[in-house]
Amino acid sequence: MPRFKLTLEYDGSNYAGWQRQAELHTIQSALEQAIFHFSGQQLTTTTAGRTDAGVHATGQVAHVDFIKNWQTYTVRDALNAYLQKQGEEIAVLNVQNVPDNFDARFSAIKRHYLFKILNRLSPPALNIKRVWWIPKPLNVDAMHQAAQKLVGQHDFTTFRSAHCQAKSPIRTLERLDVYREGEEIFLYAQARSFLHHQIRSFAGSLMEVGIGRWTAQDLEAALHAKDRKRCGMVAPPSGLYLTQVDY
């Protein structure tokens, strides 16, 4: 069966996450319904990242096996037409033929995420579901310097959800940059894989540094404590974007 790689963009605000769930509106169920409408087949998609409810993507990747070897542009255009007609906030950006051994999840060698903070006194009127609004002034330089304490291979128990299903809390964080562009602050994270709520936990803890409540040493101590209770607040999903997956 021909395997196709789909690159996706979506606003996750009105979805109960990626993963198909009974009686809930999810990205996977909406995409697979579009695939069924196009092909007449009940097919299952596999994704690089099972994003949570409210999390967005500008470069999510999934794969699906069709029985027929369609033209890639035909797949893209047909799926987009159906998704748009249904009022879904999902777009298929690109479709590629890939070998049978390509796996959107397990073939990935790097995942890139961006977390957006709106740092101003006035609340957002347009992008309220696409940023984390923090009215208190944030010290971006302090946040970036503290973030470097998290880079490298560590036991990230402090920064993962209590419901995380990963067998090991050890991950290698390749980059964690914090920078400002006008009123927006961005956290850029890069690793082969991440734990459940890891980036949102980073964002919430770095906010504590930004407002001056924590120092870089406090963040480092929280990391080494390997204790979920030592984490700062978990930032809301609205600011998180899966931007790219490398293979």
Swiss-Prot record:
Tagged with keyword Isomerase: yes
GO MF term list: RNA binding; tRNA pseudouridine(38-40) synthase activity
Catalytic activity as recorded in UniProt: uridine(38/39/40) in tRNA = pseudouridine(38/39/40) in tRNA
Residues of the signal peptide: none
Keyword Hydrolase: no
Binding site residues for substrate: Y113
EC number: 5.4.99.12
GO biological process: tRNA pseudouridine synthesis
InterPro entries in alphabetical order: PsdUridine_synth_cat_dom_sf, PsdUridine_synth_TruA, PsdUridine_synth_TruA_a/b_dom, PsdUridine_synth_TruA_C, TruA/RsuA/RluB/E/F_N
Annotated keywords: Isomerase, tRNA processing
Domain of life: Bacteria
Catalytic residues (positions): D52
Enzyme type, top EC level: isomerase
NCBIfam families: hisT_truA
Subunit structure: Homodimer.
Similarity annotation: Belongs to the tRNA pseudouridine synthase TruA family.
Reported function: Formation of pseudouridine at positions 38, 39 and 40 in the anticodon stem and loop of transfer RNAs.
Protein known as: tRNA pseudouridine synthase A
